Amino acid sequence: MIVEKKYVAAASGVLLSALVANYSLSDEAPAAWEAPTRAAAKKNPVAADTDSVAAGKKVYASNCLACHGEKGKGDGPASAAVNPKPHDLAEEAVKKQSDGALFWKLTEGRKPMPAYDKTLSESERWQVINYVRTLGK
């Protein structure tokens, strides 16, 4: 009976490892990442002034640059190890999204990007969005 439990535990571990490896090595494009309508409608309460953008740039450098890169192109030093690849934050598709949609994504995260609701204050997240809006200009 004890031997049987060991085999079940070992088989479960192998199966779990295979599932994780399959997910992380998959070349399939991730499904569209859409913010809920209510979240997308949320307005940015932080003015996109010089101070806010500068503060957002500092937060971005500490939390986002490793994957998204200096110019937001998704080519940061850690991007090679990330699957799926980080989005290009300077592309038109990102620019078309509302501040509320970007805030929701930054807050909630989606693998491999972590959620920043516990790491960054609301103000810092809005500042990052103000900074991201300057990328590609």
What feature does the model see in each segment?
Residues 24-27:
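Boundary of Sec targeting at the N-terminus
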Residues 49-73, 79, 102-108:
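Sequence/structural segment immediately N-terminal to covalent heme-attachment motifs in c-type
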Residues 2-11:
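Bacterial N-terminal signal peptides that target proteins for export
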Residues 11-19:
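Bacterial N-terminal signal peptides
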Residues 73-74, 122:
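Short, non-ligating residues that shape and space the ligands of small metal-coordination modules
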Residues 32-35, 77-82:
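Short, flexible, mixed-charge acidic loops at enzyme active sites
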Residues 29-59:
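Electrostatic cytochrome c docking/interface patches
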Residues 81-135:
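Extracytoplasmic electron-transfer domains, predominantly the class I c-type cytochrome c fold
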